[in-house]
């Protein structure tokens, strides 16, 4: 890494493939989730079947709900998909309304701590919003490694500011902890 910090991204298998696989994945999720700083729960914009996602949320993920950021993906495929403005890299008004309805529906269903973000990786639409949401959702110690690996166009001033604030917060906590340990040690000696 060279910066003294690291970023590990793990792509876990999605749910809903089969009952046998879901049971296997449930065990995997229970084992690995406590080790993660953040889970990006991806839901395709045109996917209406969310019952398996809902089951996993309620029974596995909800305990660590502050660690989950829901992302509606493939926003450019939202109906009417032929209306996507490729030149302006944005949805048509009808698509924008449908995307809002989808993110609202995901929010109502899962009631996450963090806002639901919609993106189109193919077109780059709202990736900066996703990065900002990631910076907000990640614990302070994990935001700095993300910042160092972002493409320049995603390092907006807002993201840079968030990274500075989170780094300062992490350093402050380290000093507070060190000070508490020193005070406790002195108190025991006296």
Model-assigned labels for residue ranges:
Residues 2-25:
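Switch II (G3) loop of P-loop NTPases
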Residues 21-22, 52-55, 82-84:
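Short amphipathic alpha-helical segments
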Residues 40-45, 70-73, 118-120:
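Conserved beta-strand segments of the P-loop GTPase G domain that flank and frequently precede/overlap
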Residues 21-22, 50, 96-99:
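A conditional alpha-helix N-cap/helix-loop micro-motif detector
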Residues 20-47, 56-67:
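Inter-motif core of Ras-like GTPase G domains
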Residues 15-17, 45-50, 76-79:
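Short acidic, S/G/P-rich loop/turn micro-motifs used as interaction or catalytic elements
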Residues 74-148:
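Canonical P-loop GTPase G-domain recognition
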Residues 119, 131-138, 151-190:
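P-loop NTP-binding site
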């Amino acid at each position: 890494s060279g910066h003294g910090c690291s970023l590990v991204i793990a792509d876990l298998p999605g749910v809903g493939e089969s009952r046998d696989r879901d049971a296997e994945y449930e065990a995997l999720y229970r084992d690995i989730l406590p080790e993660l700083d953040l889970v990006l729960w991806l839901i395709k914009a045109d996917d209406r079947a969310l019952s398996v996602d809902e089951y996993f949320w309620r029974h596995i993920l909800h305990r660590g709900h502050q660690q989950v950021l829901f992302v509606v993906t493939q926003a450019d495929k939202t109906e009417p998909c032929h209306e996507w403005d490729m030149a302006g890299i944005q949805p048509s008004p009808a698509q924008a309304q449908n995307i809002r309805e989808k993110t609202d529906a995901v929010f109502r269903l899962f009631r996450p701590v963090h806002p639901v973000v919609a993106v189109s990786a193919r077109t780059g639409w709202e990736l900066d919003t996703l990065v900002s949401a990631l910076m907000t959702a990640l614990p302070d110690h994990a935001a700095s490694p993300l910042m160092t690996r972002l493409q320049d166009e995603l390092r907006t001033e807002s993201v840079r500011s968030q990274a500075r604030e989170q780094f300062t917060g992490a350093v402050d906590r380290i000093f507070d902890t060190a000070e508490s340990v020193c005070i406790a040690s002195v108190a025991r000696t006296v």
